[in-house]
């Protein structure tokens, strides 16, 4: 069960500030060097393909859906889109991340937006789930070495104190996205195929782990 206690309280105990490697113009780029644009669809893929595949949603409780990384390096995961108050996605700016999945049939009334929830079940972790607000949600993108990026979550109390979005492997071997003060999941953003072509290859909502 997902408890509803103060995420901010837990967050401030373990959050670590990280140094910035932002570009001078702060623009985030996709995997081929084009500017990341709000409203367009992308796949979040690992910077190192040997660490698994893309990002998808699933849950034993059906709704809301938690967010996972596929173990299959060939699986691009579900497409996502970003929402921002700017024309381009910029580093260290608060954004909304949500799945762009027309076959969201299991949770038709549930938001596709990402959010952070506290989980007693998974070792009192702060895991990433769906059901988030359409407003800027505290997620940011930060550049790291080698042209890769990491996704971080910053509270509305301190936008300079953030936690990394990393991987928590549960007892079933599933790789859940969760907040961590340790190693982040390093990613790149791959432009999704046309909606029709992408839907044809992603009709399933639950890719294999």
Swiss-Prot record:
Q: Which CDD domains match?
A: beta-trefoil_STI
**Glycosylated position list:** 156
Q: Which cysteines are joined by disulfide bonds?
A: 63-107, 154-162
Q: One matching Pfam family, short form?
A: Kunitz_legume
Q: Which GO terms describe its biological process?
A: response to water deprivation
Record-linked PANTHER family: KUNITZ TRYPSIN INHIBITOR 1-RELATED (PTHR33107:SF13), KUNITZ TRYPSIN INHIBITOR 2 (PTHR33107)
Q: What is this protein called?
A: Kunitz trypsin inhibitor 1
- Functional note: Exhibits Kunitz trypsin protease inhibitor activity.
Superkingdom of this protein's organism: Eukaryota
Q: Which gene encodes it?
A: KTI1
Q: Which GO terms describe its molecular function?
A: peptidase inhibitor activity; serine-type endopeptidase inhibitor activity
Keyword field: Disulfide bond, Glycoprotein, Protease inhibitor, Serine protease inhibitor, Signal
The induction annotation reads: Induced by infestation with spider mites. Down-regulated in roots in response to drought stress.
Annotated signal peptide: 1-22
State the organism of origin.
Arabidopsis thaliana (Mouse-ear cress)
Cross-referenced InterPro entries: KTI1 (IPR056368), Kunitz_inhibitor_STI-like_sf (IPR011065), Prot_inh_Kunz-lg (IPR002160)
What family does this belong to? Answer: Belongs to the protease inhibitor I3 (leguminous Kunitz-type inhibitor) family.
